[in-house]
């Protein structure tokens, strides 16, 4: 099958062997797959991610649920925002059948442990024609929902998870820094919960327009106006929760310096590089 293969931190389109479903697994045809910012970061800064992952694993007790680490010298197919159609089933599959359209948590498990789909040498992601998924983790796509929209399930889930972890309440306000897919997912979930005001910040006019459509009360171009200034003009009183959804060095420090006293900051963007913050900023703004 054809696939976009990453090897030694380089990407190429190549022919690779078709995967085969094992017990409890299904073979699927990829209908749509998004390009996540973390995939782009991995190409540029994956070595830092691997080194940090190995260091943390060595410092923690063994965990059978920790995904196995990929080897960059071996071929790997990225892509974890996908929608697929089942084309074949492995032994023990009793719910799914060929023709079913599904999305899934980007993880697979077998006798050797847990693997991160799209970050695994064994389980190719959605930048390929075919994928193997575990039936247990697959979710049926409602009839009539286009595949490209269904593929947004994973980034939407990341945004919803961030909002849940923030413990934001009806008496709080929110700033979302970065209005890519995950930042927009945060906006949508905040609006669904009735949080307000919500201020979004991004350099892209198109993304700012999407954020307004999804429920932002105010959007700003950070090159022209600080997000916190917009919050002060609209409200300036309610406790503030800041969602950092950019994931590049310097953003966390910028968020800490921007946020007023008593604010909470949620790290949503995936920064794979070392970063630096000034702890005294946080202490002074407690």
What are these regions (language model features)?
Residues 19-33, 48-108, 142-144:
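Glycine-rich beta-strand-centered segment in the early N-terminal region that forms part
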Residues 237-243, 263:
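Short SAM/SAH-binding signature in class I
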Residues 217, 249-286:
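Glycine-rich phosphate-binding loop and adjacent beta-alpha segment
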Residues 225-237:
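Short amphipathic alpha-helix with an adjacent loop that forms part of the alpha/beta core around
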Residues 58-75, 80, 102-177:
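NAD(P)H dinucleotide-binding glycine-rich loop of Rossmann-like/cofactor-binding domains
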Residues 128, 171, 216, 238-239:
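Local beta-strand N-terminus motif with an aromatic residue
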């Amino acid at each position: 099958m054809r696939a976009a293969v990453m090897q030694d931190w380089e990407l190429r389109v190549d022919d690779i062997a078709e995967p085969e479903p094992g017990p409890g697994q299904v073979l699927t045809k990829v209908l749509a797959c998004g390009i996540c910012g973390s995939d782009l970061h991995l190409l540029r800064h994956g070595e830092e991610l691997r080194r940090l992952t190995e260091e943390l694993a060595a410092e923690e007790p063994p965990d059978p649920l920790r995904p196995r680490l990929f080897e960059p010298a071996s071929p790997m197919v990225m892509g974890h925002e996908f929608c697929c159609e089942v084309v074949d089933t492995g032994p023990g599959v009793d719910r799914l059948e060929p023709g079913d359209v599904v999305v899934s948590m980007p993880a697979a498990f077998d006798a050797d442990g847990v693997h991160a789909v799209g970050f695994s040498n064994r389980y190719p992601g959605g930048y390929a024609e075919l994928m193997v998924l575990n039936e247990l983790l697959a979710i049926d796509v409602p009839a009539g929902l286009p595949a490209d929209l269904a593929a947004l399930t994973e980034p939407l889930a990341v945004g919803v998870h961030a909002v849940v972890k923030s413990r934001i309440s009806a008496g709080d306000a929110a700033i979302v820094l970065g209005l890519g897919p995950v930042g927009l997912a945060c906006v949508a979930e905040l609006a669904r919960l009735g949080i307000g005001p919500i201020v979004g910040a991004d350099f892209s006019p198109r993304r700012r327009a999407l954020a307004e459509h999804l429920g932002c009360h105010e959007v700003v171009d950070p090159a022209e106006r600080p997000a916190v200034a917009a919050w002060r003009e609209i409200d300036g009183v309610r406790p503030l929760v800041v969602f950092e959804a950019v994931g590049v060095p310097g953003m966390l420090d910028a968020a800490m310096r921007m946020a007023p006293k008593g604010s909470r900051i949620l790290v949503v963007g995936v920064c794979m590089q070392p970063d630096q913050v000034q702890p005294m900023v946080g202490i002074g703004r407690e």
